[in-house]
Curated annotation (Swiss-Prot):
A Pfam family per the record: Proton_antipo_M
Family per similarity comment: Belongs to the complex I subunit 5 family.
Subcellular location: Mitochondrion inner membrane
Topological relation to the membrane, as annotated: Multi-pass membrane protein
EC number, as in UniProt: 7.1.1.2
Keyword set, alphabetical order: Electron transport, Membrane, Mitochondrion, Mitochondrion inner membrane, NAD, Respiratory chain, Translocase, Transmembrane, Transmembrane helix, Transport, Ubiquinone
Native source species: Trypanosoma brucei brucei
Region forming the signal peptide: none
Predominant place of localization: mitochondrion
Transmembrane residue ranges: 1-21, 28-48, 58-78, 81-101, 113-133, 136-156, 176-198, 245-265, 273-293, 310-330, 333-353, 372-392, 395-415, 428-450, 461-481, 501-521, 536-556, 568-588
Protein name: NADH-ubiquinone oxidoreductase chain 5
Molecular function via GO: NADH dehydrogenase (ubiquinone) activity
CC per GO annotation: mitochondrial inner membrane
Bridged cysteine pairs (disulfide): none
Length: 590
């Protein structure tokens, strides 16, 4: 019955598309996307209403489809968790396809692009619904193949073809690891035990289990851009903007997390095995934040931001909870696709210019909606109150407060550093897109500072960072650490070693040197952070961050006070609304 209604909707959409968009090639594609989007919205609304009425147990279902091709079984499963992810990915795909019509309208090979685009999304859906090793491997291979076609779509450009092959060959590393892991599991369990949920790990040797899980994690790292295997993602930005919005926001970068979610139930037995990922995730977080600060290419900027977000999602999936990590990349795909589309519009307007420092005249292009979408995406990434990012990170911190195990301090430290770094590099992007013109033009500085949306967003982010830093100082340091975990500190003081003391001395020397040059946070990078020396410096680093932020806000308050006095004396009789606006700024900073 559902297929009959779906075919009816497709026929109706094709007829209506012919009348609405004209009898041309785009009629079929636009009508098909519209109908699929309507059906997805109906299904998603039905699921949300069902959850509100019957609770989350409504998602506890599992539909299995088994296909027999000459004794070769292909098994697909549809559960509530994977159906929810698939609906979100397809909704993002529909939005990106509408933008792709605008972006690729004058391309001679638009039909080929749309066909590859659709096949890529179908392969992603097949990979999400896969239930055994063969279907998962087929979906994994097809995703790598068609991602190469999309990244190197402008094959006549040398760098597009080169970076497409680079992404393809790095993906082949993951394919080899996946084949090895599946071969070990097949040989140890028997060829009849092929599904993910019926692996007979009790019949396997412990070293085989450990080695196969290590191979699966390494395979997931190739797609989810962890440290050492992340080099393909910034270079893959040579493809079209719709390809970057789909691959780097919603599909290819989350394949590793989805692969690990298939066998997540067996990770509980080796939880301590992933303890080293704490230092690994922090290393790539600091490294990619530094790359963001020293990179002025817009597309590469978003790529490095994607690496930070996906690496933290992988860390949450492996070390905390699979559903928290999945929630992170679900909200990430929406705001990151929005960010790609908005930046793609500005790249079109500025004739292919991608240098972030040259966007200071964006206010004269008239893209009001694009500016509002950019502000909304940045505020969502910064986790401003009552947005999706705020609820995700609040749920993460609440879960960490409820948990109690020996490495909770490291988890809290990574979460706090991730939140702070996210706000810092998003403020960096906001500064270059909205404030750089005010800094470099000294003719009429007061006029340029009277931009309501920019100043309001700046005040909101600054106030949020100040309150968040105060919250971390009071709650985590004074209450959480010294009250709830005094036993942990006494245990650590009894069992410290010489290597921790050596790292402490090195850190003090580096801190003094960086503080002398005034670049403590932008140049801080030490490979020894893998060794988890956070226990000693947790309180010190938070206090330093708090003092720096307090000094920064004090300077900003004095500057705005001087601007307010100057504006009040000079422009009072002409622009009363500007005086009122600076009164609001003064109240916020006080």
């Amino acid at each position: 019955m559902f297929l009959i209604f779906f075919l009816f909707f497709i026929m109706f959409g094709f007829i209506s598309g012919s009348f609405m968009f004209g009898r041309n090639f785009l009629s079929f594609w636009l009508s098909l996307v519209m109908i699929i989007f309507i059906v997805l919205c109906m299904i998603f609304s039905f699921l949300m209403v069902s959850v509100c009425l019957y609770g989350y147990y409504y998602y506890d279902f599992c539909l299995i489809l088994m296909l027999d091709f000459c004794f070769i079984w292909l098994t697909y499963v549809c559960s509530g968790f994977y159906m929810f992810i698939m609906l979100l990915i397809n909704m993002v795909f529909c939005f990106i396809v509408f933008y792709a019509f605008y972006y690729m309208y004058f391309d001679m090979l638009l039909g080929r692009f749309l066909i590859i685009f659709w096949i890529f999304v179908v392969c992603m859906n097949l990979f999400i619904l896969s239930y055994d090793f063969l279907t998962a491997y087929c979906g994994w291979e097809l995703l790598g193949l068609f991602s190469f076609f999309l990244i190197s779509y402008f094959w006549y450009r040398f760098f597009a073809l080169k970076f497409g092959f680079k992404a393809f060959f790095i993906g082949k590393i993951g394919d080899v690891l996946l084949i090895f892991a599946f071969s070990i599991i097949f040989l140890s369990n028997g060829f009849c035990m092929t599904t993910f949920y019926f692996l007979n790990f009790f019949c396997m040797d412990y070293y085989y289990i450990e080695f196969s899980i290590c191979l699966l994690v390494g395979c997931a790292f190739t797609k989810s851009t962890q440290f050492g295997l992340h080099i393909w993602l910034p270079d893959a930005m040579e493809g079209p903007i719709p390809v970057s919005a789909l691959i780097h926001a919603a599909t290819l970068v989350v394949c590793g997390i989805i692969l690990l979610s298939f066998v997540y139930w067996c990770f509980d037995f080796w939880f301590s095995y992933f303890y080293n990922l704490i230092g690994w995730s922090t290393l790539i977080l600091i490294l990619m934040t530094l790359c963001v600060f020293y990179n002025f290419d817009v597309k590469r900027y978003v790529a490095f931001s994607t690496i930070c977000q996906i690496s933290f999602s992988m860390f949450c999936c492996l070390c905390i909870d699979i559903y928290i990590g999945s929630l992170f990349f679900c909200y990430h795909m929406f705001y990151k696709a929005t960010l790609f589309i908005v930046l793609g519009i500005w790249i079109h307007i500025f004739f292919g210019l991608q240098d972030l420092r040259c966007y200071f005249f964006m206010y004269f292009c008239g893209c009001v909606l694009a500016r509002l979408l950019l502000i909304f995406a940045i505020l969502n990434s910064c986790s401003i109150w009552f947005l999706c990012g705020f609820y995700c990170k609040d749920m993460l911190l609440a879960l960490l407060m409820l948990l109690s195990f020996y490495n909770i301090i490291e988890f809290l430290f990574i979460s706090i550093i991730f939140i702070f770094f996210t706000m810092i590099y998003n403020y960096f992007l906001l500064f270059f897109l909205m404030f750089v013109f005010k800094c470099f033009c000294l003719v009429d500085c007061l006029f340029l500072l009277f931009d309501y949306e920019c100043c309001l967003v700046y005040c909101l982010i600054s106030l949020y960072m100040c309150i968040l830093s105060i919250f971390f100082i009071i709650d985590f340091v004074c209450i959480f650490v010294f009250s709830s975990y005094c036993v942990f500190w006494s245990f650590f003081l009894n069992f410290y070693n010489f290597f921790d003391i050596a790292i402490f001395v090195v850190f003090l020397i580096l801190s003094v040197g960086f503080l002398y040059y005034g670049c403590l946070f932008f140049y801080f990078f030490n490979i020894d952070c893998i060794m988890l020396f956070w226990r000693i410096f947790f309180v010190i680093i938070i206090l330093v961050v708090f003092m720096i932020f307090c000094c920064w806000y004090f300077v900003c308050m004095i500057i705005f006070m001087l601007l307010f006095v100057w504006n009040f004396v000079i422009y009072f009789r002409y622009n009363l609304k500007y005086c009122l606006f600076f009164c609001i700024l003064w109240i916020l900073y006080v």
